[in-house]
Amino acid sequence: MANVIVIGAQWGDEGKGKITDLLSRSADVVVRSQGGVNAGHTVVVEGQTFKLHLIPSGILYPDTECIIGSGTVIDPSVLLKEMAQLHALNVTTDNLYISQTAHVTMPYHRLLDQASEEKRGKYKIGTTGRGIGPTYADKSERIGIRVIDLINTENLRQKLEWTINYKNVILEKLYNLPPLDAKTVIEEYLEYAEILRPHVVDSSLKIYEAIRKRKNILFEGAQGTLLDLDHGTYPYVTSSNPIAGGACVGSGIGPTVIDRVIGVAKAYTTRVGEGPFPTELEGEIEQLLCDRGAEFGTTTGRRRRCGWFDAVIGRYAVRINGLDCLAITKLDVLDTLEEIKVCVAYQLDGQTCRHLPSSAGEFARCQPIYRTMPGWQQPTSDCRSLEDLPKQALDYLKFLGAIMEVPIAIISLGASRDQTIIVEDPIHGPKRALLDENGSPWDNHEF
């Protein structure tokens, strides 16, 4: 039995969907614990591409129970579209369960999200405009609509009438936007409620019962560590906690039941939207990474910013999440490069900085200090074992594992399930030992 968390170790878009899909083969339950339709997972199976935003990647396995947890925010219109798309591909959603305490994204959330971002002007943060932030804000303000409210039709009308009138004042007076028609919104969401009702459960209890039965549970993260509301590169972050601790809170389970935490990172770095990005590239190499890596967002279609692997933020992700091992994705994207760089530290105001600054202003002033390594300049997408990889690719991976101080358990060399090398058992492998008092090579400045 193992309870495993899969976490993004960068700014999201690391390939968690594929890794979760791979691990779902041995999972009895897959749980999505936070975020909403601002996240996108792409899974390719036998030539078919599945793009999911809310539904856990484990849905492709009919015997795997998939739970959308209480820490998520659910847009029913998007969720129903995803379910319909899966049905069209002969994928059942009978194994999908929705937490009754998850919050619901409403039309006014989307409008407020987009209007607020536009009003920020040059201070915009790069929101997806899907209403995620305003939904979480209502949750904190304790005026949100939860799934349990959605399916309680008697109380839903009363709650929504008050809330829509309240939001209409903001839309009209602050943003000069037309008001929403409360009756239209209420009728729309009552229809959603009837369709989703059979899937609604007490998710915390359902997960707890699975733990008691010693089932294998996989907790699927959305976004990435550097987008965490508390521990990310604030204010250019999401509105939830996509770290290992957030998976426990958003699922309603205690941290002591977690056996392993797996971090997913690209062999380079990408970021969507605004915010500092020390290793960001421009020119020919950046274009190559974007083209070969198909770096366009699943949710928004926005072009991702591309740069070299940043071991400073990687080490930060190891620390914040307590990572036990890594899955490195898109190694094949680097196949044609003559040389590859890894950021091992920053130069900040004339001083060497080996840890992530908390200040966005300081982070924006960080200049990368690189270690340059030779490229392998041969294709790796057909490699299926470490022995198949070019020596330079192996050296690169060994360096990443050494500087991050966690073993690399999975190497992904393409979007398909079979384009993968399993180095060690990512689920039942050993727990990562804490460092001894002599510190690490990183602390001793050996890199």
Curated annotation (Swiss-Prot):
The keyword Ligase is annotated on this UniProt entry: yes
Xref: SUPFAM superfamilies: P-loop containing nucleoside triphosphate hydrolases
Chain sites annotated for binding IMP: D13, E14, G15, K16, N38, A39, G40, H41, T128, R142, Q223, T238, R302
Residues engaged in binding Mg(2+): D13, G40
Entry function: Plays an important role in the de novo pathway of purine nucleotide biosynthesis. Catalyzes the first committed step in the biosynthesis of AMP from IMP.
PANTHER family in UniProt: ADENYLOSUCCINATE SYNTHETASE
Protein name, per record: Adenylosuccinate synthetase
Gene name tied to this protein: purA
